């Protein structure tokens, strides 16, 4: 009697890079450093980053999250989120005599600068992004009369401009790289003189995480993306995984949201996380999988990240005035290694 061939070994393919990017690390450090310097409460307009666990942890330390600056008591400290804000928010904060600490990601600030420069040149700006996303709202506020939102290739087919020879494009930093390229292709076909931004607006971390998930999706039966549902870059990772060959892909905030039925007939599970996800949540998912026989973990490298952003100038000035070192609480790599 012929013996049946051995079953494949259950394994996990772990994407690298994953989790915190430099902008998120800086934003979280900003709130923590403000709490350390000034003591609680420190107010934060909007979620500092789009992850409910990070927000809850900062709330436990004394941060108070509000939707708008007019909810902050006059004269208080307010941190502005990593996603950026419109100029009107700075004015509102000034009128309320708030001490503002700007945690906007420097890569988002770059897009704001490009929007102002294009508008000053009299160009019409087609902003590729998702309506009502905080980053899009902030960028649009830099030049509201010059910006038209374009949400994907289909809208690009129908958007109207005043002068096709005077059009530029920008994009939200957390979009699908492939879909953004498709959208730009449509715009360039319709407006051949379309002006590009000086450099790619989609951030390095978004691109790297999408490249990594493409590699694991091509050989995984299932891809689990750790991230909150309001995180644009996390949601895009699910889309990229499905487009890149994964039979199934799901977004979970943590291991408690995994459905055991997803593992039926699955031998290889890919795991990654969005740019606002602490490594401890990924560790929890790996432990959950290990309990179910997926205890072999192979890290799949797409890119090694070393970028670190300095703290906002408001905090650096305060630290200097107090004679304290201009240090960050930890780098993303330090936190990742500590969690693991």
Swiss-Prot record:
One of its GO terms (molecular function) is 4-hydroxy-3-methylbut-2-enyl diphosphate reductase activity. Isopentenyl diphosphate binds at residues 50, 83, 133, 231-233, 276. Its EC number is 1.17.7.4. The active site is at 135 (proton donor). It catalyses: isopentenyl diphosphate + 2 oxidized [2Fe-2S]-[ferredoxin] + H2O = (2E)-4-hydroxy-3-methylbut-2-enyl diphosphate + 2 reduced [2Fe-2S]-[ferredoxin] + 2 H(+); dimethylallyl diphosphate + 2 oxidized [2Fe-2S]-[ferredoxin] + H2O = (2E)-4-hydroxy-3-methylbut-2-enyl diphosphate + 2 reduced [2Fe-2S]-[ferredoxin] + 2 H(+). Keywords: 4Fe-4S, Iron, Iron-sulfur, Isoprene biosynthesis, Metal-binding, Oxidoreductase. Residues 320-340 are annotated as: Disordered. [4Fe-4S] cluster binds at residues 21, 105, 203. It holds the Pfam family LYTB. The keyword 4Fe-4S applies. Dimethylallyl diphosphate binds at residues 50, 83, 133, 231-233, 276. InterPro entries: LytB/IspH. Its cofactor is [4Fe-4S] cluster. Pathway: Isoprenoid biosynthesis; dimethylallyl diphosphate biosynthesis; dimethylallyl diphosphate from (2E)-4-hydroxy-3-methylbutenyl diphosphate: step 1/1; Isoprenoid biosynthesis; isopentenyl diphosphate biosynthesis via DXP pathway; isopentenyl diphosphate from 1-deoxy-D-xylulose 5-phosphate: step 6/6. Binds 1 [4Fe-4S] cluster per subunit. One of its GO terms (biological process) is dimethylallyl diphosphate biosynthetic process. The keyword Ubl conjugation does not apply. (2E)-4-hydroxy-3-methylbut-2-enyl diphosphate binds at residues 50, 83, 133, 173, 231-233, 276. Belongs to the IspH family. Catalyzes the conversion of 1-hydroxy-2-methyl-2-(E)-butenyl 4-diphosphate (HMBPP) into a mixture of isopentenyl diphosphate (IPP) and dimethylallyl diphosphate (DMAPP). Acts in the terminal step of the DOXP/MEP pathway for isoprenoid precursor biosynthesis. This is 4-hydroxy-3-methylbut-2-enyl diphosphate reductase. It comes from Acidothermus cellulolyticus (strain ATCC 43068 / DSM 8971 / 11B).
